[in-house]
């Protein structure tokens, strides 16, 4: 039996893992002739379902973390530039004007 199947993340499939392991240990000919295939198919289905559930949970957790990080960034930006980043908007406009003026001066020479 694969050691990764005994992991905590597949705890929901423990019954299927034990059933397949028991079938494999009973009689060797059952294993050879594929008489344990029903147990194996059930285990594969359970593992796939468990894996999908783990992926869904991970996506949800990452979205929650991302939203929290973005809230923190917005709070830091508001502390630095004021509400709705008004100061940043003004500074960006002034920077754009200066850059345009310097470009115009360079082009006129």
Curated annotation (Swiss-Prot):
Record-annotated membrane-spanning stretches: none
Record's keyword annotation contains Mitochondrion: yes
Locus of motif Cx9C motif 1: 13-23
Gene Ontology MF: a single term: metal ion binding
Subcellular location: Mitochondrion inner membrane; Mitochondrion intermembrane space
One GO CC annotation: cytoplasm
Membrane topology: Peripheral membrane protein
Domain CHCH: 10-54
Disulfide linkage: 13-46, 23-36
UniProt cross-references to PROSITE patterns, sorted A to Z: CHCH (PS51808)
GO biological process: one example: mitochondrial respiratory chain complex assembly
Position of sequence motif Cx9C motif 2: 36-46
InterPro entries referenced in this protein's UniProt entry, alphabetically: Cyt_c_biogenesis_Cmc1-like (IPR013892)
Swiss-Prot/TrEMBL keywords: Chaperone, Copper, Disulfide bond, Membrane, Metal-binding, Mitochondrion, Mitochondrion inner membrane, Repeat
Source organism superkingdom: Eukaryota
Comment text on domains: The twin Cx9C motifs are involved in the recognition by the mitochondrial MIA40-ERV1 disulfide relay system and the subsequent transfer of disulfide bonds by dithiol/disulfide exchange reactions to the newly imported protein.
Protein purpose: Required for mitochondrial cytochrome c oxidase (COX) assembly and respiration. May be involved in copper trafficking and distribution to mitochondrial COX and SOD1.
Subunit structure: Interacts with CMC1.
Remaining remarks: Present with 279 molecules/cell in log phase SD medium.
Similarity comment: Belongs to the CMC family.
Protein name per its UniProtKB record: COX assembly mitochondrial protein 2
The organism of origin for this protein: Saccharomyces cerevisiae (strain ATCC 204508 / S288c)
